[in-house]
Amino acid sequence: MTDWVQLLIATATALLGALGLAYWAYRAQSDRSALVGLYLLFGIPAVLLLLAGTAVLVRGDRVLGPMLLLIGLGLGLPLLRPFREALARVTPLDPDSAIDMTGLSIVLGLLGLFVGNSLAPMADDPPELIPSVGIVELLVQAAFLVAIAYIAVGLPYWRDLRAATERLGIVAPDPRTIGIAIAATFACFVVAAIAGLVSQQFDPGLSESLDEVVDQITAQVQNPIGAVVLGASAGIGEEAIFRGALQPRYGIIIPSLLFMMLHGPQYGFNLALLGLLAVSI
């Protein structure tokens, strides 16, 4: 019961925080004081992290120091207009948008965190102990990611439900879309197979280790219903946030990198993630 309460409290807190930040960014589009507040919200932690990371790195910590620096850079770089303008040349990002700036700070900050984690000793090895997930946890995770995706594209502030759904690209598939999806599925299997062969050549024991990790994660859902829920929850939730919300604004590379690094703590920061990146792209 305690785990359920903690899960619900954490989920509700994150959603309320996302709603508050989305409204703040929306107000910052036309309210200069709100925009200044956003710069302070991300800029102060960024500066402190950069200073702390530099100090820790000078003292010889080659793991925590770079991690703090990367997170600080991720939070702080989007606040610099030249950085946003440079990124806007290769992505659909609007350099004048406070909303885009806010989202980019969060995305790059998270990316810095996960890249920093990959620098830890033995980070490339799959973890030995991974808690398994149940059907309810998967459903809550999917609902949470979908809710975050809707909030990220403006619900309920600058888009209504219909407009937000259209912005996320959630529509009934037509025959052409179904055909593309089937072809893409086969292509993903090919890419995954190639990645498996490459990892087998360079790290022969990796495949067996990953199989053990997957077995641990899916221990509670190794049944027909669990398999359907596992596939649907991951597909719906992750596609909504990465493909629906992030990719149309930040291009395909940044969301794909975040998607790849997000799975590092589960599978280890190793060659398997390169295959995941290729599949994601």
Feature locations, PLM:
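C-terminal halves and exits of single transmembrane alpha-helices
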Residues: 72-83, 106-120, 188, 257-263
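A generic, lipid-embedded transmembrane alpha helix
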Residues: 40-57, 109-117
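Alpha-helical transmembrane segments
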Residues: 6-13, 59-74, 130-148, 184-185
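Membrane-water interface of transmembrane alpha-helices
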Residues: 17-27, 67-89, 148-161
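A cytosolic-side transmembrane-helix exit/cap motif
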Residues: 57-58, 84-93, 271-273
